[in-house]
Amino acid sequence: MPRRRRGPRCDPSSALAVDVAAAVAAATSRTRAQKVRKAKKVLAANGHKWHRRAKTPVNKRTLVAARLLAGVRCHNRFYGALVSSFETAYCMNHRHGSDGLAATIIAEACGAVPVCSLNTTIMFEVNLGGRRPDCICVLDRAGVAGAPRESVCLIVELKTCRFSRSALTESKKNQYATGLRQLRDSAKIICDVAVPGADFVHIVPVLVFVAQRSMRIMDVRKFNERVVRANAELLRLRLAALGVYSRSFAAAPQRLQSAQDRCHDHAATPKPTPAVVPSPPAPPNPAPPQSRVGFGSALAMATAVMLGEYARENKPPR
């Protein structure tokens, strides 16, 4: 192999060395830019994306998988936070209501009612065959035994958002359309699998948008509900058997009013203003005061007068 000839050596501090180094750097930078442009074209043709910071190609499938894993982690965190919210609401047993995830979601279906006044069964990842809703809550009030009751089957579909500044992004629009289809199909399947009965079951689909980092509820959208005549207890048992995890909470009994509640009611109830009763006008010529001498006093006075007269008449002579 022939030996490569070397050029003349020069001092690194000389002007020639500085110019040569600048030329080499410029040529290298131009070559780098050309390579980057060519790599971008090749990656775009193959369905890949160029990462600006790392200057390395990133596969779109890898990004989608990473975002999917982040959504799964957020779902699991939301499930734990929702169960903790129900536990707190039932442990507090406060009749003035409570705040949190449980109260926010139940308010969409049942209105502003205390969470602890309902019999609640919450189920996660319910496998309905065609669909797999994230969460289903069966709510009913404690009514008279043997009488038809009204239950609420709340279907919750969770959508996690990485950025919570704007709700009009393309990804959120796609999530809304996807969630609407999922809720519609889930409600139809539940209506089909419900066992006919005498109870009234309100099927309420709800779409919830949650921020991934702060777990803050960004938006809750309720869609048209359906009312079916079914056996609410059998429907609850069937959905609980199809879920990956289920938890039941019994309605709290009516407790005696504590001193704190009485103080709360006393402070909340406005005090009535006493009515001013006008005093009657004084008569122009007041009557003279009447004597208050009773019958016994009059008899004693008459007896004393008679005894005095008798003593004077029978007075012995001197």
Swiss-Prot record:
One of its GO terms (cellular component) is host cell nucleus. It comes from the Viruses. It holds the Pfam family Herpes_UL24. InterPro entries: Herpes_UL24. GO terms for biological process: symbiont-mediated arrest of host cell cycle during G2/M transition. It is found in: Host cytoplasm; Host nucleus; Host Golgi apparatus. The keyword rRNA-binding does not apply. Residues 258-293 are annotated as: Disordered. Residues 271-289 have a biased composition (Pro residues). Keywords: Host cytoplasm, Host G2/M cell cycle arrest by virus, Host Golgi apparatus, Host nucleus, Host-virus interaction, Modulation of host cell cycle by virus. Belongs to the HHV-1 UL24 protein family. May play a role in the dispersal of host nucleolin from the nucleolus throughout the nucleus leading to a decrease in ribosome biogenesis. This is Protein UL24. It comes from Psittacid herpesvirus 1 (isolate Amazon parrot/-/97-0001/1997) (PsHV-1).
